[in-house]
Amino acid sequence: GLPCDCHGHTGTYWLNYYSKCPKGYGYTGRCRYLVGSCCYK
């Protein structure tokens, strides 16, 4: 995914995960967008 900013964290933008982040990456939070989510560790 593309890098993105979420609550001051640098995260990864996932286009295919609309409401949750993929498991197995150790993400601790996210920001939802109209399409996709920004997931950060």
From Swiss-Prot:
Localization, UniProt: Secreted; Nematocyst
Positions of disulphide bridges: 4-38, 6-31, 21-39
Gene3D superfamilies per record: Anthopleurin-A (2.20.20.10)
SUPFAM superfamilies: Defensin-like (SSF57392)
Record's keyword annotation contains Mitochondrion: no
A Pfam family per the record: Defensin_4
GO molecular-function terms, A-Z: ion channel inhibitor activity; signaling receptor inhibitor activity; toxin activity
GO CC list: extracellular region; nematocyst
Keywords recorded for this protein, A-Z: Disulfide bond, Ion channel impairing toxin, Nematocyst, Neurotoxin, Secreted, Toxin
Function description: Neurotoxin. Causes paralysis in crabs.
Family: Belongs to the sea anemone type 3 (BDS) potassium channel toxin family.
UniProt name for this protein: U-actitoxin-Bcs2a
Organism: Bunodosoma caissarum
